[in-house]
Amino acid sequence: MRTYSGRGHLNLGGEESPDENARLASGVPGLDALMGGGFSKGRIVLVLGEPGTGKTIFCSQFLHGGAVGRGEKGIFIGMNEPKVKFLGEMKALGMDLTALENDGKFSYVDASDVKHIPEQAKVGRIPVGGRELGLVNLLDTIQEAVDKTKPDRIAIDSISDLIFRYPALEDRRPVILDIVETLQATGATCLMTSELLSTSQDRTLQPEEYLAEGVVILKMLRKGTRTIQVLKLRGSKMDTKPRPYLIGDNGIEVLSSEEVYE
């Protein structure tokens, strides 16, 4: 098991600089028009949103689209709900991830135990901080899944339960940085979701927004009205205006040419 330095520096080796000209389709209809054709290959993108905005669906479409459209392998690292429930909900939206799993194009990794580790735990007889052990377990889980699958796309849903165990914002930064560096070392294009803490126009940026290479914000303006905004996407031309989106029978669809009226 690796050790956690608390400084945000893990050297896994094998990193390659992303090709900023290479694009991966997001799998979300209408979204690529806001991002110059898709996500930059090999980048780490944060998807921030309130509950009910479709973060899990967003990640699933990203992985499903890569597998069906391009034959790419994807890993979903779930920290919130059981695999059976997740697969059933996504199948109801037209994404048969079980079939893709049988074809070797999709893997579900259950990392929910990370958030259940007590504040004080033990490795053998040695007492360790539960928060730190949770992080180490997550990073090991990611690396083991990558070594086994060699994925092109990875999604983690969500990192909130882990990082919110650190009340002080300055303590969260090295945790997030370790997650980001671990994902960067895989060479895959990665999404990680987190809870949006404030929807106000003058909100304070969350630590994970500074460390990710791309940021997509999902908001609920009022009942039935949702907006998506590409806030940051390194190496890409962006439409940064909030745009409306729908969650229908086939998942998320971005209305990229429509304005948002509050």
Language model feature labels by segment:
Residues 115-178, 182-184:
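Phosphate-binding/switch loop-helix module in NTP-utilizing enzymes
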Residues 2-3, 184, 188-251:
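Phosphate-binding/switch region of NTP-binding enzymes
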Residues 50-125:
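Conserved P-loop
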Residues 80-84, 92, 112-116, 160-161, ...:
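Conserved nucleotide-binding/hydrolysis micro-motifs of P-loop NTPases
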Residues 73, 105, 150-153, 185-193:
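Loop/turn-to-beta-strand initiation segments
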